[in-house]
């Protein structure tokens, strides 16, 4: 669910990821953007290239340089998180 309006300088999106869901992104999806993930409830497993992070409610994670990533819900209930995206440069 898009939270921000088109006039706001960042895209703010609330996501609900059901149990067992996996969402992979190629490295190219992160070119020219900065991204912050904030977990509101549940558990989020974030594979950041070869490194795997287990995030819980209240945790935040700033994504660094572009690399393949996968968002997973390995928990028993829904995971709700917010993604904030800003542009870092013009392609």
Tell me the role of every PLM-derived stretch:
Residues 14, 29-46:
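Short, conserved beta-strand element in jelly-roll/cupin
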Residues 8, 76-77:
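Short strand-connecting beta-turns/loops that link adjacent beta-strands
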Residues 1-27, 34, 84-85, 89:
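A short glycine-rich, His/Asp/Glu-containing loop-to-beta-strand
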Residues 49-66:
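Short acidic-glycine-tyrosine-enriched beta hairpin
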Residues 62-65, 69, 81-91:
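Amphipathic alpha-helical interface segments
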Residues 25, 46-47, 69-75:
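Short beta-strand His + acidic residue motifs that chelate non-heme Fe in jelly-roll/DSBH
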């Amino acid at each position: 669910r898009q939270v921000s309006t088109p006039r706001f300088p960042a895209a703010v999106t609330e996501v609900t990821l059901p149990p067992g869901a996996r969402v992979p992104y190629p490295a190219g999806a992160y070119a020219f953007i900065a991204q912050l993930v904030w977990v509101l409830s549940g558990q989020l497993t974030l594979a950041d290239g070869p490194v795997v992070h287990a995030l819980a409610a209240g945790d935040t994670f700033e994504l660094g340089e572009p690399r393949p990533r996968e968002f997973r819900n390995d928990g028993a209930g829904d995971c709700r998180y917010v993604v904030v995206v800003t542009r870092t440069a013009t392609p």
